[in-house]
């Protein structure tokens, strides 16, 4: 088994990671590092964390054998880790609970977050409602338009949603504005970052909270494989979509020592890797500093961040978590691209063959799993992290498919009738 101990004490994964933040945030980051070091192995903290995951989130999430899909691909058996079944509909809640528990212990009454697809924003608003914390969510104005159901969910849960009009009006810009808020309100505010990026300790901390995904898989997969008469304890490949990369790192990390299992991250190739309209930082980016850490980013020859594109708001980001950059460099993980069209086709295919509506982000991982399965034997296996459900995306998919999503009698202006139940 591979020996793997990352990051180092300063938050570096090889030459990536670290902490590149303004002097104003130095004290806040030191305070956060000390708090996490104090509680990360504290029995009472961990007991509460796992209790919340079990009773509030509904963990462990099941693994499902996609039998019909596997049969139609004619190769490897495909298994889905059903993070879409979590409370709030995605993997994001795992990390948010852990960070919100830290916020309470640190005496921070106000929480801020950034969001792209809206799932991290919904998860943050949810746990702030549960814990009685003020919640402000920054979201790119473009994402506000394409993820309107999640915007309304956040507001229902009591959050203030701030549309960000600067730059490309997507996730990168939302993160920039959240950082500015944190600088201005550092004394009473806790910033819950939603991915394995940002200055140390965020990449490590988010990974640790999300690693419950892979830890469960290590326990679940032997039985699932035995049920299909596959003589193995681990899958031949683990596949997950990668934007910032938290769902991927959550399922990858416990598998890193198991060298016979391939770890495959799927980036958003958009309109094609050579089109200039994609979000594939690891395949078309270069090393640089973004949002407080050194990683692979999409930048021009002058070091300016270039605009990105993806059909999925959650993958529309010009960087990636530093641990992913390190895993690629040492050859432990590999990264591929899936286009908008391939992801959309996989979205429809999973709906119609397995009765599961996946998030567009997750559809990228499903699409590559379908491609890979055809090249493997029927006694081999693929585990896909189905990171979220697609309810939030049906408006986008309908638009792209030429369907009038709102073709129904209007309910606007209709009074709600009836009084209290007798």
From Swiss-Prot:
Stated name of the protein: Tryptophan synthase beta chain
Job description of the protein: The beta subunit is responsible for the synthesis of L-tryptophan from indole and L-serine.
Entries under PANTHER family matching the protein: TRYPTOPHAN SYNTHASE, TRYPTOPHAN SYNTHASE-RELATED
Cofactor(s) needed by this chain: pyridoxal 5'-phosphate
HAMAP family: Trp_synth_beta
Entry keywords, A to Z: Amino-acid biosynthesis, Aromatic amino acid biosynthesis, Lyase, Pyridoxal phosphate, Tryptophan biosynthesis
Subunit details: Tetramer of two alpha and two beta chains.
Organism: Paracidovorax citrulli (strain AAC00-1)
Pfam families (UniProt xref): PALP (PF00291)
Gene: trpB
The protein's Enzyme Commission number: 4.2.1.20
